[in-house]
A protein has these predicted regions:
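Short, intrinsically disordered, charge-balanced linker/junction segments flanking boundaries
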Residues: 1, 244-247
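Short coil/turn connectors between adjacent alpha-helices in alpha-solenoid helical repeat scaffolds
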Residues: 63-67, 94-106, 130-141, 168-184, ...
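Short helix-capping/linker turns of helical repeat alpha-solenoids
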Residues: 121-122, 154-156, 160, 198-200
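TPR alpha-solenoid repeat register
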Residues: 125, 159, 201-203, 243-245
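"A position-specific structural signal for the A-helix of alpha-solenoid helical repeats
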Residues: 128, 162-169, 206-213, 247-248
Length: 248
C-alpha cells in the first residue's frame, strides 16, 4: 500500500483523513498480532508482514463477504491508476484473477476488464480476461483473448496452461471426434508444460484434475497413471506438499 493509491481510492488528498484510515487499520491488525509496517526506505509505503493472514483474509472475504469484497475491488479498479501500484510488473501476474472476478461479479466484470485494458493491454491482462470469459462460458471470446496473449508472449508456460484449460473446458461436455481431438491437444499442452517448465506444480495439478474428469465422465482412464506419476514425483522431491496435490 502507498499513499498515492490511498489518495486515489478515497478520492482525497487530506493527509489527516488518510492517516486516520491507516491508524485504524493498524489498530485492528495489531489486535491479532499482524503488523502493517512502514517501509524503511520509503515512509509513504506500508507492507502487511503476514502472508498467512493475507491468504486467510482473502479466503474469508471471498466466502463470507463477497458483496463487500467485490465493491472494494470495483472501487479500486475504477479509482486507482495502475501506474500508481508499487511493483506493478509483479502485481499484474496474479491480479484481476479470472476465476475470482467470475465468482464475485458474475457476468458484470466485462466493464472492469475494459477499464484495466485501458492501462494494460498486455498478455497477462488478456490471459485473465480469457479465463474470466471461460468461466462465464463465453468460449469464443476466451479463445480470442488467449490467442492474442499467445501472440504477445507465446513462450510463457502460464499462458500456454491457460490455453489448455480453456480448450478442455470448452470441449469436456460433448463427445465428438472434434472435441476428442481438442481434449487430447489440451492434455498434450499440459504435458509439454510440465516437461519444460521449472514450475511444474500447477501443470501437474491441472493434468490430474482433467485426468480424473475424463476417467469419471468419459470412461477414459488413459491419463491417470501419468498424472499419478507426476504428483508422486512432486511430493517425493518436495516441490509440492500442498493438501490439494496430495488430495489429487
Amino acid at each position: 500500500l502507498n499513499m498515492d493509491v490511498l489518495c486515489a481510492f478515497e478520492n482525497t488528498t487530506d493527509y489527516k483523513v488518510l492517516r486516520e484510515y491507516i491508524n485504524a487499520t493498524q489498530g485492528y491488525l495489531s489486535e491479532i498480532n499482524v503488523p502493517l509496517s512502514q517501509d524503511i526506505d520509503n515512509q509513504d509505503y506500508y507492507e502487511l508482514r503476514s502472508n498467512l493472514f493475507a491468504r486467510l483474509a482473502y479466503d474469508v472475504l471471498k466466502s463470507h463477504f463477497k458483496k463487500e469484497f467485490g465493491a472494494v475491488i470495483r472501487k479500486f479498479i475504477l479509482n486507482v491508476s495502475l501506474y500508481n501500484i508499487y511493483q506493478y510488473h509483479v502485481f499484474r501476474r496474479s491480479a484481476f484473477d479470472g476465476k475470482l472476478f467470475s465468482d464475485l461479479f458474475g457476468d458484470d466484470a466485462y466493464d472492469l476488464y475494459e477499464r484495466i485494458f485501458q492501462f494494460d493491454g498486455g498478455a497477462y491482462t488478456l490471459q485473465q480476461r480469457a479465463l474470466y470469459k471461460s468461466h462465464r462460458r463465453d468460449f469464443k471470446g476466451a479463445f480470442e483473448d488467449i490467442d492474442k496473449a499467445i501472440s504477445i508472449n507465446g513462450s510463457n508456460f502460464s499462458i500456454k496452461n491457460s490455453h489448455a484449460i480453456i480448450l478442455f473446458e470448452a470441449n469436456k461436455d460433448k463427445r465428438t471426434p472434434i472435441s476428442e481431438e481438442s481434449i487430447a491437444e489440451a492434455m498434450d499442452t499440459l504435458r509439454k508444460c510440465f516437461s519444460s517448465d521449472k514450475r511444474k506444480v500447477y501443470h501437474a495439478q491441472k493434468f490430474a484434475e482433467f485426468a480424473i474428469y475424463l476417467a469419471k465422465n468419459w470412461k477414459d482412464s488413459s491419463y491417470l497413471e501419468e498424472a499419478k506419476k507426476w504428483l508422486a514425483q512432486l511430493i517425493d522431491t518436495q516441490e509440492s506438499n500442498s493438501s490439494f496435490t496430495k488430495y489429487l
